[in-house]
């Protein structure tokens, strides 16, 4: 892996933050120079909570890029989608600021993992969806899914959106976080999605994230 990758999820609370941290940790262990970025963090004041989680999982302290806010260029106080959080905070989301920060990180690190807010269709502004931004920047996507009820539907909808927008899927990460809810559904979801990934995105990688991987 080399370059900038956008980490998205099929839904909220799918384990995207943990997955991003674990992937970064694995890349560090492989000798890669890697950093994570949360371009838009909502529900916070000063420090992006997700970046703090990434650093803890990676086993490293906050970096100079964190202190300079390159990894968390836009923070809004209200816990909502970016377009609403920005409106409630009374200021516009600065896309140029985000782009510049990501470019600076990409110049310093071999791999930049950009964790989005929610799923592909989350609005960044009133007129721009997350998937629009991904396409504009040309980022390949790492999509996080799980075995909870509804994941097959949400994953296939995400597949369809990526195809429609002409965005490359780098990998599908199956997070075992929800396996305990229903083992039958979890196992069937895993088997089904693994087959669909091979059929729909033959060049994409299949990854699995165990509950213990973040420890």
UniProtKB/Swiss-Prot annotation:
ATP binds at residues 13-18, 50, 115-118, 175-176. Its main location: cytoplasm. Pathway: Cofactor biosynthesis; biotin biosynthesis; biotin from 7,8-diaminononanoate: step 1/2. The keyword Secreted does not apply. It is found in: Cytoplasm. Gene3D superfamilies: P-loop containing nucleotide triphosphate hydrolases (3.40.50.300). Its cofactor is Mg(2+). GO terms for biological process: biotin biosynthetic process. GO terms for molecular function: ATP binding; dethiobiotin synthase activity; magnesium ion binding. Keywords: ATP-binding, Biotin biosynthesis, Cytoplasm, Ligase, Magnesium, Metal-binding, Nucleotide-binding. It is an enzyme of class 6 (ligase). The active site is at 38. The keyword Nucleotide-binding applies. Substrate binds at residue 42. It catalyses: (7R,8S)-7,8-diammoniononanoate + CO2 + ATP = (4R,5S)-dethiobiotin + ADP + phosphate + 3 H(+). Mg(2+) binds at residues 17, 50, 115. Catalyzes a mechanistically unusual reaction, the ATP-dependent insertion of CO2 between the N7 and N8 nitrogen atoms of 7,8-diaminopelargonic acid (DAPA, also called 7,8-diammoniononanoate) to form a ureido ring. Belongs to the dethiobiotin synthetase family. Homodimer. HAMAP family: BioD (MF_00336). This is ATP-dependent dethiobiotin synthetase BioD. It comes from Neisseria meningitidis serogroup B (strain ATCC BAA-335 / MC58).
């Amino acid at each position: 892996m080399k370059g900038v990758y956008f980490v998205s999820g099929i839904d909220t609370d799918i384990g995207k933050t943990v997955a991003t941290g674990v992937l970064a940790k694995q890349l560090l262990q492989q000798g890669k120079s890697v950093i994570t970025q949360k371009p838009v963090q909502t529900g916070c004041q000063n420090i992006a909570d997700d970046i703090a989680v990434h650093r803890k999982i990676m086993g490293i302290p906050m970096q100079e890029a964190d202190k300079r806010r390159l990894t968390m260029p836009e923070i809004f106080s209200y816990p909502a989608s970016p377009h609403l959080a920005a409106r409630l905070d009374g200021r516009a989301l600065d896309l140029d600021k985000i782009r510049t920060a990501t470019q600076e990180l990409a110049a310093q690190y071999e791999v930049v993992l950009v964790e989005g807010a929610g799923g592909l269709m989350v609005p960044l502004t009133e007129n721009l969806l997350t998937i629009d931004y991904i396409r504009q920047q040309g980022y390949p996507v790492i999509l996080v899914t799980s075995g909870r009820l509804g994941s097959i539907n949400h994953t296939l909808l995400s597949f369809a959106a990526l195809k429609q927008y002409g965005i490359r899927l780098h990998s599908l990460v199956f997070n075992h976080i929800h396996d305990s809810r229903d083992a039958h559904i979890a196992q069937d979801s895993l088997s089904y999605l693994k087959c669909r990934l091979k059929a729909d995105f033959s060049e994409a990688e299949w990854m699995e994230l165990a509950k213990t991987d973040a420890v």
